């Protein structure tokens, strides 16, 4: 490590129970990346009292010796869709190839990504676990959203997420114009790595850009929207889908991949590369009125689907996963 960073960044901290001290590096993750860049291999950490389990929430070029290393992979978009991100696909593939062989277990957030990991890296299916993730709206958030500042007009079509090519923004804007709807299209989220053309495609079209708002205002915008329109080109999960469904808001999203999986048959699906298909579904949603059978079917189906991703459901999956770990590593846990 001393070869990777100035010695002044390596300090010693007093232990809580042993009375001794231990080396402390404040930016170990940066060091790991430098180590991987130079030596093309993972950085292994050694400790006198390693934890039983090290649960990495992101794929980093670092693992801990003498412990069960679990690495979370949220998506493989830089590898499966390299034109949609600025992340170096070769470096990520090299990193994941080493993590796949040296970590004990990989976890991910959808069955779509799990199958991609198995197929691309040839890993045994038993070593990749889909835990999904906690998503939705808490009881506290439901109370707070009623008094949150309004940032989007009621009855709009809303798209939540980074405004970038991967979210299919230009096709969405074009489809919204073609649909003939008079409802505004609200794009709520920060700028991405590129700059999609957001200019209106028709005289009647209204496109509203909201680059940032509080969590409470975001949820208020969702619950007051006519529908969520989310024709993303690639996702590992699709958080806005679950949030909208939890609030009883109809959802349009992309057919195939993680978006269709997370929607679980409770959304209207489109071909994300077909502008007319997106426009037709926007028009169909535009004509739906709250309280009608079609509307209620989407609303009720979405709320039921959102229950799969509640805190209680996630706790159940984690408990089952811990049981699975004890079965896999009976002598280490």
Specify the residue positions occupied by each region the protein language model found:
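Carbohydrate transferase catalytic cores enriched for Leloir-type hexosyltransferases
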Residues: 1-333
């Amino acid at each position: 490590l001393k070869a990777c960073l100035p010695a002044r960044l390596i300090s010693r901290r007093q232990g809580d129970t042993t009375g001794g001290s231990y080396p402390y590096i404040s930016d170990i993750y940066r060091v790991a990346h430098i180590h991987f860049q130079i030596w093309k291999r993972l950085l292994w950490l050694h400790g006198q009292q390693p934890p039983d389990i090290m649960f990495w929430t992101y794929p980093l070029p670092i693992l801990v010796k003498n412990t069960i290393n679990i690495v979370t992979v949220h998506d493989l978009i830089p590898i499966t869709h390299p034109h949609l991100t600025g992340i170096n696909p070769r470096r990520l593939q090299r990193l994941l190839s080493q993590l796949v062989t040296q970590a004990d277990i990989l976890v991910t957030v959808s069955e779509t990504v799990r199958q991609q990991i198995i197929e691309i890296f040839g890993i045994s299916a038993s070593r990749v676990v889909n835990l999904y993730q906690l998503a939705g709206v808490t009881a506290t958030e439901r109370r707070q959203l009623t008094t949150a500042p309004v940032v989007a007009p009621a009855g709009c079509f809303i798209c939540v997420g980074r405004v970038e090519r991967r979210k299919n923004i230009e096709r969405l804007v074009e489809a919204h114009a073609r649909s003939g709807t008079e409802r505004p299209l609200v794009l709520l989220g920060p700028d991405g790595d590129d700059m999609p053309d957001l200019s209106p495609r028709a005289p009647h079209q209204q496109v509203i850009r909201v680059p940032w708002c509080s969590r409470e205002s975001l949820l208020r915008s969702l619950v007051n929207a006519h529908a969520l329109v989310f024709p993303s080109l690639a996702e590992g999960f699709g958080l806005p889908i679950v949030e909208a469904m939890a609030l009883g808001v109809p959802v349009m999203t992309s057919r195939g991949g993680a978006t269709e999986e997370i929607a679980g048959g409770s959304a209207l699906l489109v071909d994300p590369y077909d502008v007319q298909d997106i426009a037709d579904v926007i028009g169909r949603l535009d004509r739906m009125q709250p309280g009608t059978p079609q509307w209620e079917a989407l609303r009720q189906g979405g709320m039921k689907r959102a229950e799969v991703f509640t805190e209680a459901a996630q706790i159940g999956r984690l408990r089952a996963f811990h049981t699975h770990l004890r079965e896999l590593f009976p002598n280490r846990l």
